[in-house]
Amino acid sequence: MAITKEEVISFIENMSVLELANLVKELEEKFGVSAAAPVAVAAAGPAAGPAESAEEKTEFDVILKAAGANKIAVIKVVRGLTSLGLKEAKDLVDGAPQPVKTGISKEEAADAQKQLVEAGAEVEVK
């Protein structure tokens, strides 16, 4: 007697998360496939980016590339632009290149870039 699809689904529904994870791993090894398809779908999303570049971009990211010579002034500006504490702002500046602000308007990005450059930082707006 063959097992029906419904019986297989019912059996899988009653498995614990650990048992299900082991089953997936065994199936991947047996059939030489990967269950990471959602990652591949998400990676395909940015491919549409160049087509959208014809339209005007509405969200920008301010990236701190380097702190420059006056790191203390840059840390102060980063704290002013964000809601970060002193340690977090210092870690961000020390870890450059890092995003300072993401998903902001063109005007806000230009203002943030101006403040950071005046403090001596090297900044990129994407």
UniProtKB/Swiss-Prot annotation:
- Key words of the record: Ribonucleoprotein, Ribosomal protein
Q: Would you name any one GO CC term? A: cytosolic large ribosomal subunit
Spans through the membrane: none
Q: Spell out the disulfide connections.
A: none
What GO MF terms are annotated?
mRNA binding; structural constituent of ribosome
- Tell whether Ribosomal protein is among the UniProt keywords: yes
Q: Which SUPFAM superfamilies match?
A: ClpS-like, Ribosomal protein L7/12, oligomerisation (N-terminal) domain
Alphabetical GO biological process terms: translation
NCBIfam families the record matches: L12 (TIGR00855)
Q: How does it assemble?
A: Homodimer. Part of the ribosomal stalk of the 50S ribosomal subunit. Forms a multimeric L10(L12)X complex, where L10 forms an elongated spine to which 2 to 4 L12 dimers bind in a sequential fashion. Binds GTP-bound translation factors.
Role: Forms part of the ribosomal stalk which helps the ribosome interact with GTP-bound translation factors. Is thus essential for accurate translation.
Regarding protein family, the annotation reads: Belongs to the bacterial ribosomal protein bL12 family.
Query: Could you tell me what this protein is called?
Result: Large ribosomal subunit protein bL12
What species does this protein belong to? Citrifermentans bemidjiense (strain ATCC BAA-1014 / DSM 16622 / JCM 12645 / Bem)
Q: What is the lineage of its organism?
A: Bacteria, Pseudomonadati, Thermodesulfobacteriota, Desulfuromonadia, Geobacterales
